[in-house]
Amino acid sequence: MASSGQPKVVLLDIEGTVCPISFVKDVLFPYALSALPATLEAQWDKPEFSQYRDAFPAEHASSQEALTAHVKDLMSRDVKIAYLKSLQGYLWESGYKSGELKAPLFDDVAPKFVQWKKAGEEIMIYSSGSVAAQKLLFKHTNGHPADLIPEISDFFDTVNAGPKQEASSYQTILAAHPEFPEANSWLFLSDNVKEVEAAKQAGMQSFVVERPGNAELSAEDREKHRVIKTFAEI
């Protein structure tokens, strides 16, 4: 473990850290797009859907066609904006519940969750995906146990914490848990070097996770940060 000692809290990214980036890009995103037209047709005027529709800018929520076009544009550019993330979570929910969607965790993830929890360490999640989408993913995995929600203490996204590449977001997360006041008792794991740097600026320990399919790390990245290939190295 790092010189600061065993962490009390392990804060985890999702894409490229606990599951392949390809799951989001090649499975979840296409599923949302394919489910969108029928969902809008069936739910457009229903009260339970209005919170998702009305969160969009007015010009894009004026019709089903306008909203669909805006969603396609945002997703083609991988824009991480809260109202899109909320709608995606809503669209994915039926797929997870039907069993059509199941999160393919890396083999070391579920066993390590159980190990961390038994050791008294808290597990928390910080992802650009909405908290609702995070909970769906961890409730429906290919791991053992398949439902990892009981192992997780809290969830953060860009709404309740802020942008993932800003140190202030990690300070917000720290402030949400005054029972763990020492920043260096937190360990943040992510495939994104800029996120790791932001967490370190906030005082957390942070490692870069190198998984199959992730972006190539530079020699400078490897020199500046501890890089792990599996949670078993922690």
Curated annotation (Swiss-Prot):
Keyword DNA-binding: no
Chain sites annotated for binding substrate: S127, S128, K164
Keyword terms of this UniProt record: Amino-acid biosynthesis, Cytoplasm, Hydrolase, Magnesium, Metal-binding, Methionine biosynthesis, Nucleus
Pathway of action: Amino-acid biosynthesis; L-methionine biosynthesis via salvage pathway; L-methionine from S-methyl-5-thio-alpha-D-ribose 1-phosphate: step 3/6; Amino-acid biosynthesis; L-methionine biosynthesis via salvage pathway; L-methionine from S-methyl-5-thio-alpha-D-ribose 1-phosphate: step 4/6
Functional summary from the UniProt entry: Bifunctional enzyme that catalyzes the enolization of 2,3-diketo-5-methylthiopentyl-1-phosphate (DK-MTP-1-P) into the intermediate 2-hydroxy-3-keto-5-methylthiopentenyl-1-phosphate (HK-MTPenyl-1-P), which is then dephosphorylated to form the acireductone 1,2-dihydroxy-3-keto-5-methylthiopentene (DHK-MTPene).
Self-association state and partner proteins as the record states: Monomer.
Name used for this protein in its record: Enolase-phosphatase E1
Native source species: Podospora anserina (strain S / ATCC MYA-4624 / DSM 980 / FGSC 10383) (Pleurage anserina)
